UniProtKB/Swiss-Prot annotation:
One biological process term in Gene Ontology: translation
Organism of derivation: Actinobacillus pleuropneumoniae serotype 5b (strain L20)
NCBIfam families assigned: rplD_bact
Protein name as it appears in the record: Large ribosomal subunit protein uL4
A GO molecular-function descriptor: structural constituent of ribosome
This protein's encoding gene: rplD
InterPro entries, per database record: Ribosomal_uL4, Ribosomal_uL4-like, Ribosomal_uL4_dom_sf
One annotated Gene Ontology cellular component of this protein: ribonucleoprotein complex
Length: 200
C-alpha cells in the first residue's frame, strides 16, 4: 500500500503495519497495561499495629460512663490506624511483545484510515524557537499534533516544550497512549521506515 507524503511522491509501506484491521480489545488491553505500568504504587498507610503509641488500655472497662476502649490506636479514634491500610504495590501488567507490536500496528492503521497520519519528507526547524514551530504547524493546518522523527531533533524538542498540544518523539519513544492522545500524528518518511523495521 502507499501513503501520501506532503509535497513529495507517495511512500510504499507494508500492509501488515499500516493496513491492519482495528483490534479495539487488544488496543484497550495494551493501553490499560501501559497506564498501569506508569503508576508509582508507593502509597503507604499504617494499620493499628504500626501506629506509634501506647498499648495501655486508656481507662478501665466499666464504671466510667464512657464507651469502652482498649487501645488508643483503634481505627475509630483520631490518629488511630487505618482499617485496611494501603501498602506499596506493583501495578504493572504483563504484555507480550507480539501483543504490544500488534496494538501499535492497529493504532497506526486506524490513524491512516481516519486520515490522522500526516507523512512528511522531513520535519525540522533552524532554531529552537516556539514561534517558528507554531508557524510550521500552521502551514500544515495543525495545532494538536504528535511529531515523530527518525532521531530526536533537539531544536524541535526544545521548541515544542512550551506547547500544550504538541509533543516530539523519536521512533524509540512512541507508545500507544501518545499515538491516540493527539488529533494528528506527523511522521517523517525516515521514521516510517524505522517503524516498519521495528515492528517487523
Amino acid at each position: 500500500m502507499e501513503l501520501q507524503v506532503v509535497g513529495a511522491n507517495a511512500l510504499t509501506v507494508s500492509e501488515t503495519t499500516f493496513g491492519r484491521e482495528f483490534n479495539e480489545a487488544l488496543i484497550h488491553q495494551v493501553v490499560v497495561a501501559y497506564a498501569a505500568g506508569a503508576r508509582q504504587g508507593s502509597r503507604a498507610q499504617k494499620t493499628r499495629a504500626e501506629v506509634s503509641g501506647s498499648g495501655k488500655k486508656p481507662w478501665r472497662q466499666k464504671g466510667t460512663g464512657r464507651a469502652r476502649s482498649g487501645d488508643i490506636k483503634s481505627p475509630i479514634w483520631r490518629s488511630g490506624g487505618i482499617t485496611f491500610a494501603a501498602k506499596p504495590q506493583d501495578h504493572s501488567q504483563k504484555v507480550n511483545k507480539k501483543m504490544y507490536r500488534g496494538a501499535i500496528k492497529s493504532i497506526l492503521s486506524e490513524l491512516v484510515r481516519q486520515e490522522r497520519l500526516v507523512v512528511v519528507e522531513k520535519f525540522e526547524i533552524e532554531a529552537p524557537k516556539t514561534k517558528v514551530l507554531v508557524q510550521k504547524l500552521k502551514d500544515l493546518a495543525l495545532n494538536d499534533a504528535l511529531i515523530i522523527t527518525a532521531n530526536l531533533d533537539e531544536n524541535l524538542f526544545l521548541a515544542a516544550r512550551n506547547l500544550y498540544k504538541v509533543d516530539v518523539r523519536d521512533v524509540q519513544g512512541i507508545d500507544p497512549v501518545s499515538l491516540i492522545a493527539f488529533d494528528k500524528v506527523v511522521i517523517t518518511a525516515d521514521a516510517v521506515k524505522q517503524i516498519e523495521e521495528m515492528l517487523a
